[in-house]
């Protein structure tokens, strides 16, 4: 079942794509080359249309700082371990994008001069204007900030039009669709409705950044082939969170 206003959407010129690290592992620890290659092919097909694409990747296929903390590790140290995991994912995606013939740059919030550029928003925007895909690694470079928050902050700083949240579900539901077959998918919803209904779109800090700065969020299913292109083109997929 579906719910929400189904307004006509228009395509986007510059987007921020947030990818969960767990997807890169294919459900296991490490990197699944087949998954990363598939994602790279989807991004490459969109980049060839002239759309400007920035990417933030999580590191959950290697480390999750909060989970490591529960096992007794220092939270600061475990968060930095997670940041290093994101960089490994960034380099893997960069390699597969270059195999597709797409010019690509990795920028990190922690200085890693031998493998990536430092995060410089003006340089990132210039790369995008030249048709390069830009991948941001190492989160915010500080503990206690998620990669969802990184994606929201970077999207605002480099003037993206929308934050595309790639998930393993079709969008935002009023209940868990895996356990409730009658769960309703929202096609479009406002940030206020998300709060009132207690729905989960992104972590609280990321969601607040987007809401306060009127940054639309599109939650969609990455596992459906071609959905990145559909999302960038503004087709009616997933859930659009917009005032």
UniProtKB/Swiss-Prot annotation:
ATP binds at residues 18-21, 60, 64, 173, 176. One of its GO terms (biological process) is UDP biosynthetic process. Signal peptide: none annotated. Catalyzes the reversible phosphorylation of UMP to UDP. It catalyses: UMP + ATP = UDP + ADP. GO terms for cellular component: cytoplasm. CDD domains: AAK_UMPK-PyrH-Ec. Transmembrane segments: none annotated. Belongs to the UMP kinase family. This is Uridylate kinase. Inhibited by UTP. Its main location: cytoplasm. It comes from the Bacteria. NCBIfam families: pyrH_bact (TIGR02075). Homohexamer. Gene3D superfamilies: Acetylglutamate kinase-like. Pfam families: AA_kinase. It is found in: Cytoplasm. UMP binds at residues 59, 79, 140-147. Its EC number is 2.7.4.22. It is an enzyme of class 2 (transferase). One of its GO terms (molecular function) is ATP binding.
């Amino acid at each position: 079942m579906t719910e929400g206003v189904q307004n006509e959407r228009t395509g986007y010129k510059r987007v921020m794509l947030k990818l969960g690290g767990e997807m890169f592992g294919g459900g296991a620890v490490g990197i699944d080359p087949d998954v990363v290659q598939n994602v790279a092919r989807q991004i490459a097909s969109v980049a060839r249309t002239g759309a400007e694409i920035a990417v933030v990747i999580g590191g959950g296929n290697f480390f999750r700082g909060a989970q490591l903390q529960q096992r007794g590790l220092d939270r600061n140290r475990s968060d930095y371990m997670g940041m290093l995991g994101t960089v490994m994912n960034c380099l893997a995606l960069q390699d597969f994008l270059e195999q597709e013939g797409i010019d690509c740059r990795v920028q990190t919030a922690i200085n890693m001069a031998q493998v990536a550029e430092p995060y410089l928003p003006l340089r990132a925007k210039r790369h995008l204007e030249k048709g390069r895909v830009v991948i941001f690694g190492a989160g915010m470079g500080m503990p206690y900030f998620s990669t969802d928050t990184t994606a929201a902050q970077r999207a605002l700083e480099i003037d993206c039009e929308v934050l595309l949240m790639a998930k393993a579900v079709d969008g935002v539901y009023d209940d868990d669709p895996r356990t409730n077959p009658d769960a309703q998918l929202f096609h479009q919803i406002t940030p206020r409705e998300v709060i009132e209904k207690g729905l989960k779109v992104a972590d609280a800090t990321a969601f607040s950044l987007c809401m306060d700065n009127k940054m639309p969020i599109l939650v969609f299913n990455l596992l459906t082939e071609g959905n990145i292109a559909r999302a960038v083109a503004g087709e009616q997929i997933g859930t659009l969170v917009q005032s």
